Amino acid sequence: MPTSHLPTSMSCIAIREPGGPEVLVPQQQPMPSPAEGEILVKVMAAGVNRPDVLQRKGLYPPPKGTSEIPGLEIAGEVVAIGRNVTRWKQGEKVMALVGGGGYAEYCLAFEGHALPLPATLSMIEAAAIPETFFTVWYNVFERGKLAKGETFLVHGGSSGIGTTAIQLAKALSARVFTTAGTPEKCAACRKLGADLAINYRTEDFVALTKEATEGRGVDVILDMVGGDYIGRNYEAAAVEGRIVQIAFQAASRANVDMMRLMLKRLTHTGSTLRARSVADKSAIARAVETHALPLIAAGKVRPVIDSTFPLHQASAAHARMEDGDHIGKIVLTL
């Protein structure tokens, strides 16, 4: 579909140089055009995620061939389609996982990485779904194989990932434990359905999860911390437990007792999302559409929105994320 009906340039947020939030600056760039299998979305809201912060600092460069504009999830309206796109039409509302480019007025997405906008959600809520729901579904339920009746521990329960993981695991009948850094954050996690919320600053999550499981330990652990949490996760895990690593905010290296892993027959795996193939991410999208979107439609799961900022205040949104006080997702609006 031609894009002659659209502007030739767009507003976006560029990273002037690696650094703090202040390096995020408004800029004009040429309008992208959808290639085969792609859709062009007029962005109405874009989620802010921890990888965006790492990219801004120069620690997480975009994969080859993707936009250098930050932003990994969007919601908006399809305004143009590339060749061989069959699912989406101009004017339809979608939310989409993108490899980059979300902090902009217009953004390209692969056809298979877009999902229909649930009627129960606003654009702001929809923009908070793709990165977190794709990450949680794939890592907790596909890699971690969390099953009904099992126990689940997610660190950082008040984050976008954490608030999503608590709700999805609870909706699918797991017993949910989480860690958070303040009494207020722990209370928010309990309100979302966590059976046990542990203040990691004042309490020992290993001891408390052992007590809650009568010494058995936790079946599945989703960890974004790394560092010394790795060894402590091995202590907290049940025999045949599964630990899934999706980040390492403390450290990527750890000195751990491998004998504990062997004796408990633990599985410690991990993954990233951004660099996965188009086909892989399309498969995850279909799984989210099949299993998670009905839970949203039924009101059992809902994105938690901490705050919103207009696009030109992306630097303030990043400062909010880095101050550590947020509960749920931070979203940019256009």
Language-model region placement:
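N-terminal Rossmann-fold NAD(P) dinucleotide-binding loop
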Residues: 162-163
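Phosphate-coordination loops involved in phosphoryl transfer and adenosine-cofactor binding
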Residues: 9, 148-150, 218, 240
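Glycine-rich beta-strand-centered segment in the early N-terminal region that forms part
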Residues: 30-48, 59-101
